[in-house]
């Protein structure tokens, strides 16, 4: 049996939030469960909280939920809107995971490394590639490139790539094949003999 171990309750009035908090603890105790006090808290959040904090010269609190930091901000029309970005802890964890992943693949060819990276990164961007999180996505891409640059240059004592070479396209041609293999190292994508129909463009997902 799986339990939902994270949840967020939203209330307009502080008294309602406090009452809910106490009732949840009582209800969970009935089933022999308890709240993690260190991870449970009441915060002032939302449009009214932003207005109050502006008068006090402070910023509203933020909270982390499901890998995202939720914070008060404004949309393009200057109206209040909750925005989300990758939480600091999750970002650091994912960067370390990818760094170790690339390190474990350093004996493979560049083609194999990029193919495996694509599979991992596709899942990352399907989850974290949401509205307002573009800066976080680009930052993650940059860290992936740094890790790739670090590990491919450890494969031999002589440096394999400089930074500019890594950001530019590296072209390879398979022996006896008529179509070139194009490695988009700057985007960490591999295209093998890609072709498109006339009048249509092939769009690659950003990393």
Predicted regions and their residues:
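Non-catalytic terminal/accessory segments
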Residues: 1-207
């Amino acid at each position: 049996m799986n339990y939902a171990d994270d949840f967020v309750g939203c209330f307009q009035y502080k008294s309602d939030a406090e009452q809910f908090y106490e009732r949840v603890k009582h209800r969970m105790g009935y089933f022999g469960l308890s709240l993690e006090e260190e991870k449970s808290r009441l915060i002032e959040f939302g449009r009214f909280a932003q207005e109050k904090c502006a008068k006090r010269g402070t910023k509203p609190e933020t909270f982390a939920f499901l890998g995202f930091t939720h914070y008060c901000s404004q949309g393009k029309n200057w109206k209040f809107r909750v925005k989300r970005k990758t939480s600091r802890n999750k970002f650091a964890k994912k960067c370390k995971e990818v760094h170790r992943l690339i390190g474990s693949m350093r004996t493979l060819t560049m083609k194999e490394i990029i193919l495996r990276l694509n599979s991992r990164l596709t899942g990352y961007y399907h989850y974290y590639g949401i509205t307002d999180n573009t800066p976080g996505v680009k930052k993650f891409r940059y860290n992936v490139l740094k890790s790739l640059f670090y590990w491919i240059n450890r494969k031999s004592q002589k440096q394999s790539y400089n930074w500019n070479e890594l950001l530019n396209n590296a072209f390879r041609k398979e022996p006896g094949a008529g179509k070139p293999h194009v490695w988009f190292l700057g985007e960490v994508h591999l295209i093998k003999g890609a072709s498109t129909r006339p009048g249509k463009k092939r769009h690659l997902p950003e990393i």
